[in-house]
């Protein structure tokens, strides 16, 4: 597997962004200026090409509004001898990763949006691919300011589908705990309660119990006497139900009896 990654300045109407050669294929992600009659400046867009390295035969091509590169995540990456990843953005925001399966003559592609927080694709211990996504604006009108809700997406690759699905099993629980701890340290509980509870719901399948953290959050909400004990637990219970309604696991009341 040979990785070639290059960056260049705008040359003519095209900027070369990156190229990867892996498992007999070459993937290239370019940035170019697209113009139409009457345009003064044109629009910056992207172009993706996949060719067989041996004979340079084109096997797949896509024109996309995505522009190559995602900050610290390269525009094109060879993950292993089966997968390549392409990452692009819409004018510096809303990042999207595309995963290409390149084994033998079989080619498949799956996409996952990472919104405004790009991160690399990970290879799990069992060989599957996973990626962390921080979703925002899940409760418009209820929450002000940026609130980031974590979801680990795992690539499902079988006869039924090739695509990313949310994962909340025990193998990814630690990823949710990492987000919980980082959020806990960044702001008071009352300011980030929904995303804290989302992380705890997502981590329920792990080995570590969430019960003690629920008690701590309830106590923190009572500091400054903004909430009494009943008010704090009512608020937490309300958000637990709302989070379950948008796809997070339901709260296991039997695992933490009497907490909420």
Predicted feature residues:
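Acidic, glycine-anchored loop motifs typical of Ca2+
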Residues: 77-85, 124-131
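Repeated scaffold domains used in trafficking and secretory/extracellular systems
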Residues: 68-75, 115-123
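Structural motif
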Residues: 43-47, 92-100, 140-152
């Amino acid at each position: 597997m040979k990785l070639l990654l290059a960056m260049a300045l705008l040359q003519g109407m095209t900027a070369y962004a990156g190229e990867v050669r892996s498992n007999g294929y070459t993937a290239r992600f370019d940035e170019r200026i697209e113009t139409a009659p009457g345009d003064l400046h044109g629009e910056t867009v992207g172009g993706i090409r996949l060719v067989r390295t041996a004979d340079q035969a084109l096997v797949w091509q896509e024109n996309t509004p995505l522009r190559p590169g995602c900050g610290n995540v390269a525009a094109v990456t060879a993950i292993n001898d089966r997968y390549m990843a392409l990452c692009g953005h819409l004018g510096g925001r809303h990042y999207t990763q595309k995963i290409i399966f390149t084994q033998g003559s079989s080619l498949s592609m799956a996409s996952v949006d990472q919104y405004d927080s790009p991160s690399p694709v990970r290879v799990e211990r069992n060989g599957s691919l996973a990626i962390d996504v921080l979703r925002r604006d899940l409760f418009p009108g209820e929450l002000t300011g940026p609130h980031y809700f974590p979801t680990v997406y795992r690539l499902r690759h079988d006869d039924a589908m090739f695509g990313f699905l949310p994962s909340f099993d025990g193998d990814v629980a630690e990823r949710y705990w990492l987000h919980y701890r980082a959020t806990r340290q960044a702001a008071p509980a009352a300011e980030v309660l929904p995303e804290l509870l989302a992380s705890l719901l997502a981590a329920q399948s792990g080995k570590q119990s969430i019960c003690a953290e629920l008690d701590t959050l309830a106590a923190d909400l009572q500091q400054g006497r903004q909430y009494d004990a009943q008010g704090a637990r009512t608020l937490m219970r309300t958000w637990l139900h709302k989070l379950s309604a948008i796809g997070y696991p339901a709260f296991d009341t039997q695992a933490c009896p009497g907490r909420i």
